[in-house]
């Protein structure tokens, strides 16, 4: 059986920014031990001759072919813009000179 210490549970809780009581710490340690023991069962599985799985579903190239299509005219796209400049949307700067 995998032993999970109180310190390990407290460390994990701290990483997750969780505050847990001593009772919850003990309960969480038991839960984590059960999870780790369950996962350890995979070590005893006979995988001889089984090809590794890279994806849970056997999907290949589910994307469509790229096709160039006519978009909306630039004038129409910019028609309702508050401000434009040189045929592009003009938006307020979000970075000051120090960040740029």
UniProtKB/Swiss-Prot annotation:
It comes from the Bacteria. GO terms for molecular function: asparaginyl-tRNA synthase (glutamine-hydrolyzing) activity; ATP binding; glutaminyl-tRNA synthase (glutamine-hydrolyzing) activity. Its EC number is 6.3.5.-. Heterotrimer of A, B and C subunits. It catalyses: L-glutamyl-tRNA(Gln) + L-glutamine + ATP + H2O = L-glutaminyl-tRNA(Gln) + L-glutamate + ADP + phosphate + H(+); L-aspartyl-tRNA(Asn) + L-glutamine + ATP + H2O = L-asparaginyl-tRNA(Asn) + L-glutamate + ADP + phosphate + 2 H(+). Keywords: ATP-binding, Ligase, Nucleotide-binding, Protein biosynthesis. It is an enzyme of class 6 (ligase). Transmembrane segments: none annotated. This is Aspartyl/glutamyl-tRNA(Asn/Gln) amidotransferase subunit C. GO terms for biological process: glutaminyl-tRNAGln biosynthesis via transamidation; regulation of translational fidelity; translation. InterPro entries: Asp/Glu-ADT_sf_sub_c, GatC.
């Amino acid at each position: 059986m995998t032993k999970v210490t109180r310190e390990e549970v407290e460390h994990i809780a701290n990483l997750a920014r969780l505050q847990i009581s001593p009772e919850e710490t003990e309960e969480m340690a038991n839960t984590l031990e059960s999870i780790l023991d369950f996962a350890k069962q995979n070590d005893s599985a006979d995988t001889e001759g089984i090809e590794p799985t890279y994806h849970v579903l056997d999907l290949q190239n589910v994307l469509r072919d790229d096709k160039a299509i006519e978009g909306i005219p630039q004038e129409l796209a910019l028609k309702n813009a508050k401000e434009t400049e040189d045929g592009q949307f003009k938006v307020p700067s979000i970075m000051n000179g120090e960040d740029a």
